[in-house]
Amino acid sequence: GPFDKEIDKQVVAIEQNGEKEATEKTGRSGCLPWIGEGWYRTIITIPEGYSNGELIFDGAMAEPHVWVNGEDVGYWAYGYNVFALDITHATGGCKPGKHAVAVHLQNVEESSRWYPGAGIYRPVRLVLHKEKYIKTWSNFARTMMVGGIASDHATAAEARLRVSCEAVVSKHDGMSVTQTLRDASNNIVAQETHYLSDSKTTDITLAVKNAELWSPEHPYLYTLVTELKEGGKTWDVVEAKVGVRDISYSAEGFKLNGEARKFKGVCLHHDLGPLGAAFNKAAFRRQISILKDMGCDAIRTSHNVPAPWQLEICDEMGMMVMAESFDMWKYPKCKNGYARFFEQVDTESVNRDGKPWWERDITNLVLTTRNHACNIMYSIGNEIPEQSSAEGLKYSKLMQELIHRLDGTRPCTQGMDKAEGAMWSGVWQEMDVPGFNYRVHLYDKGYKNSAKGYVLGSETASTVSSRGVYKFPVEENHGKQYSDGQVSSYDLTACWWSNLPDDDWMWQDKMPWVIGEFVWTGFDYLGEPTPYDEYWPSRSSYFGIYDLAGLPKDRAYLYRVHWRPEAKTLHVLPHWTWKGREGEVTPVFVYTSYPEAELFINGKSQGRLKKMDVSMADFLENRVEERLPWGEMGKFADP
């Protein structure tokens, strides 16, 4: 590949990793050629009959600046966000014919902690409107009530769906909005019409009988059709896939459709491994399919606004989503990161609106994700340095309040790695969902310092391994390095700030007030090669449960055993080709959903091991959960 250790070489101390002195980091952002400037040019064709137009970018890396027919139509700072630009004036009121579009992008060094990609890596849409139309992103469908939920939590006797939208019209007289809900067989199950009066907005409640409820196990989607009419003339039609489902967070935990459950989630970076950062539907579907087979039911879009296609696929396939926004606010984690823009008010761009970038980005995040059934929570930040300060509390309140105004149906969280500082500043208590990044030893303190009645493992584990690589002696360690730049796949290596999966599971399973976890990470990703941040040519992560190609590491079977105990899982490690280890003891681990296992080597039994349930006190002394080990690690098992 086009890897070069000089690309974005950074001499820095990674503060969130606890580093005090700056050292050379060659692989932090993937060593791929993403830095520089680029231009895109294309021709669009506008047919007759339209008077208003927009270009909608699902994301462009980075700082996209757009011209149409040589006229500046706008700029956006954040390369991960969705944004819309009005091109009506630049196209002469949507004059029929061909129009030239030019897009300038730039990526500067030290602007990312991982590989961000470069260029137009998500779709761009041309959206055309007639004289009167439904305002883009104004349609908002939310489940207001679900009654008579069946025992399987897949259906309900009745549900109410509230739908609001805003029409762009010069006069209200005679204008109406019809909301129609169709089932998967295209049958009309609910329909209501409201006439516009003094307002351009409508609020319509649809009553749905015998409703099919959306969940990861039953990802049922309806089609919502919004029509703007004037007499017998239809001005605009907007369609959206929506799910009917009920979510709640309380001292009784997280409930979906009335059923308490814990998130079995993973964090995902936006790249697709060897395919890079350009979004690919088939590749993402494959990722979701792989994760679901492991028992995963949720993803966290770490640490950025998700691609709209991600949410569409998660709706269809049944995967809950924590929709994240930022990796930093005012205080930079890297020299030229988003902190350059966070508080900045754009005073120059033609699409400026007088608001700081954080507010514009949060607004677009909510408006573009709130109709998706899979979206069950927003995250306003990851390991934000300000979390321990009064300033952090101020911005936490501002962002959470903004989200509540735009979408009062979902809670907010942020991943807090300095939890004690966040408890001191009040940020911990402020968030709808208090989120721990690691720090399992503080879970009890966090629970007692919040009136919410629950805590979330917003980021957990950070166990590292290389697929198919085994190191000796086999021992639990934190960040141990080897001369070949690999990490042992015995699944006993965590980072200095983190822990093994077993530690998380004990809290998840034993404490009803822990509502789930999001493991770092589901798949390996480009950049951030901890624990080999200073080792060339290491340039991609070791955190993944699956590797860059989506192939399972041993940990995938460990998580499958824990998250899908009803499935039949039996996995033995390591491989058994050990030239040079003749006569030495080679530990064997078995990950299985069965209650016990017997190991045979060349037909000779090595003994039978049985799982056992343990108390928290016993666990802290001697972990016994999903692993059945033979050999020198036998102290971890119940013989």
Please state what every model-predicted region is.
Residues 1-30, 78-79, 89-161, 169-175, ...:
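An acidic-aromatic loop/edge-strand motif
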Residues 16-19, 30-137, 168-171, 184-185, ...:
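Accessory beta-strand-rich segments of carbohydrate-active enzymes
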Residues 37, 96-97, 158, 197-201, ...:
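Solvent-exposed, conformationally flexible loop/turn segments
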Residues 40-42, 81-85, 200-206, 622-626, ...:
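Short strand-edge motifs at loop-to-beta-strand transitions and within beta-strands
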Residues 53, 157-165, 584-588:
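Structural beta-strand segments of beta-rich domains
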Residues 67, 182, 227-229, 255, ...:
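Core beta-strand residues in small-molecule sensory/regulatory alpha/beta domains
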Residues 71-72, 110, 123, 131, ...:
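Extended substrate-binding grooves/exosites of carbohydrate-active enzymes
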Residues 92-96, 164-248:
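Extended acidic/polar, glycine-enriched regions
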